[in-house]
Amino acid sequence: MAVGKVVVSVASLLLVVGVAIGVITFVNKGGGANGDSNGPINSHQKAVQTICQSTTDQGSCAKTLDPVKSDDPSKLVKAFLMATKDAITKSSNFTASTEGGMGTNMNATSKAVLDYCKRVLMYALEDLETIVEEMGEDLQQSGTKLDQLKQWLTGVFNYQTDCLDDIEEVELKKIMGEGISNSKVLTSNAIDIFHSVVTAMAQMGVKVDDMKNITMGAGAGGAARRLLEDNDSKGLPKWFSGKDRKLMAKAGRGAPAGGDDGIGEGGGGGGKIKATHVVAKDGSGQFKTISEAVMACPDKNPGRCIIHIKAGIYNEQVRIPKKKNNIFMFGDGATQTIITFDRSVKLSPGTTTSLSGTVQVESEGFMAKWIGFKNTAGPLGHQAVALRVNGDRAVIFNCRFDGYQDTLYVNNGRQFYRNIVVSGTVDFIFGKSATVIQNSLILVRKGSPGQSNYVTADGNEKGAAMKIGIVLHNCRIIPDKELEADKLTIKSYLGRPWKKFATTVIIGTEIGDLIKPEGWTEWQGEQNHKTAKYIEFNNRGPGAATTQRPPWVKVAKSAAEVETYTVANWVGPANWIQEANVPVQLGL
């Protein structure tokens, strides 16, 4: 066979999966699939068994597909996706009816969280429509897209968990959990189906690649999507287009380093870049607020909307809706252009974790450089996010994020951060995305009296095989100036498992002596550590000693053990966005 891509139909791949994992039931001596004596199962039942065997909830999967009178795996998969779409629609309608039924008994926070639930469920529907559209009518020639479609399905699942994660009122959380449980189960099963196919393809040596320049249709919101391709020779993801590479280069050209090791500091003034919109507090730009500039960007933009935010302190909360895709913001330096706001769950009525964010990115293709993001609520405000990113393919360079609890919310999609500073106390890097933070400075702060510090809190609740998790590569984890004197008495940990399959990997990183010898800790009242995945490899510094790590933390001995978590494999296919001088080369 000639070397090159092998394009395989979904139908044939699903049959391969059935054989590969040994799930097709062969009937002997007239026995049924379950060992009964009701006669041999028909071809439809065999196909359903094949598809459903690898799912988390096989009973639900079979029940969904039983009414589909076909043995064509392609038709069954599409029918499953359509059933998932119907279930999410019902979840959205249930949310609206729940809100309406509460009437005057609903407080400001309940109103806010239910409105947020309606919004993210609509996003889930839009993405699911995209998935169905990209698979086509006959689902043929889809083999090369399956890994990407699985990533989008993971986002659909995360949108539904977002809703529940933001609800703190016990009774409302129970009501909503029951109301949207069916759509969560179906979405989870859909991810499992795609994962099995992709795994089988990899085992066969079939290349799982993404099609180029796939564009969403109007039914899915119309926002342009550019999928991943192969690795770039200069260390940039191929989904990071040539034009975007030039924009990033120009935005940083001639920028002096400064501050903490030059990370996240300095300024560029935009170099030779030509902004689409200019924001300036002194009136020298087209807009005085960032929100105005965002709303002036085109909806469903196939190109790039470029916003230059001139030096100044912008006291505003900025939300970038899903339809405002492909926005690139750049400032005049992370300590010169600062977006700040004071909003928190504890001190701001009608606020949830997601809604506390100073900047809230809900769109694809977001880029930022030379900007500071702050939430000034303080430690008494509890959850208070500086930046929340829900959109896929986020690339952020030379920025700074300051807060206390929940500073940086890496909540969905694939995200890459390079040369940033992020400060905080409790769970201050957290979320449910595939995120790599590289060559960055992580400052642990002093919080409320008696409060411990946790750098990370990953929220993977789907499964250990999913690309959901936080990777810190070639970073520095040290105390800030206020914590320095008390760094050995205040307990600080690398992280704790927010959800059942929490995944966090630390590679080639300097870990200061502020980190307790055990390194990691359990989530109070939960058993998530038993199924979580924590890996350390080739770290350095006094806090990197692993002799007292708990047994559920893996200390990798070779690069091969962490190859999955390179930029190329975790947020790719991709290569390093910039070369990093680390003692181990990953992805070789």
UniProtKB/Swiss-Prot annotation:
Substrate binds at T353, Q383, R496, W498. GO terms for molecular function: enzyme inhibitor activity; pectinesterase activity. Expressed in flower buds, pollen grains and pollen tubes. Glycans are attached at N93, N107, N213, N231. PANTHER family: PECTINESTERASE. Residues 42-193 are annotated as: Pectinesterase inhibitor VGDH2. The gene is VGDH2. This is Probable pectinesterase/pectinesterase inhibitor VGDH2. SMART domains: PMEI. The keyword Cell wall biogenesis/degradation applies. The active site is at D406 (proton donor), D427 (nucleophile). Residues 1-22 form the signal peptide. SUPFAM superfamilies: Pectin lyase-like (SSF51126), Plant invertase/pectin methylesterase inhibitor (SSF101148). Pfam families: Pectinesterase (PF01095), PMEI (PF04043). Keywords: Aspartyl esterase, Cell wall, Cell wall biogenesis/degradation, Glycoprotein, Hydrolase, Secreted, Signal. CDD domains: PMEI-like_3. In the N-terminal section; belongs to the PMEI family. In the C-terminal section; belongs to the pectinesterase family. It is an enzyme of class 3 (hydrolase).
